[in-house]
């Protein structure tokens, strides 16, 4: 991962909040999803997290990694 990418599988709640449109609740939802479902298999899977829709995904797509 390059320095400006955020790893969906390793990022902390604080790191996830750096994404556009992602506040505390959404960041916590991403971490909870990861704990329940296991590691993200693709960045597209982020859209399965409650509160993360296509618009938020599109804004952050280039900053996401696994």
Predicted region positions:
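Acidic-histidine catalytic/liganding microenvironments
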Residues: 19, 37, 49
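N-terminal, intrinsically disordered low-complexity tails/presequences enriched in Lys/Ser/Pro
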Residues: 1-6, 11-12
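Short, charged, surface-exposed loops that flank catalytic or proteolytic processing sites
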Residues: 42
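Short, solvent-exposed mixed-charge patches
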Residues: 64-66
């Amino acid at each position: 991962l390059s320095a400006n990418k955020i790893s969906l599988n390793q990022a902390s709640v604080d790191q996830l909040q750096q994404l556009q449109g992602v506040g505390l609740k959404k960041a916590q939802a991403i971490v909870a999803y990861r704990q329940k479902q296991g590691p993200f298999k693709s960045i597209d899977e982020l859209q399965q997290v409650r509160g993360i829709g296509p618009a938020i995904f599109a804004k952050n797509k280039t900053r996401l990694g696994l």
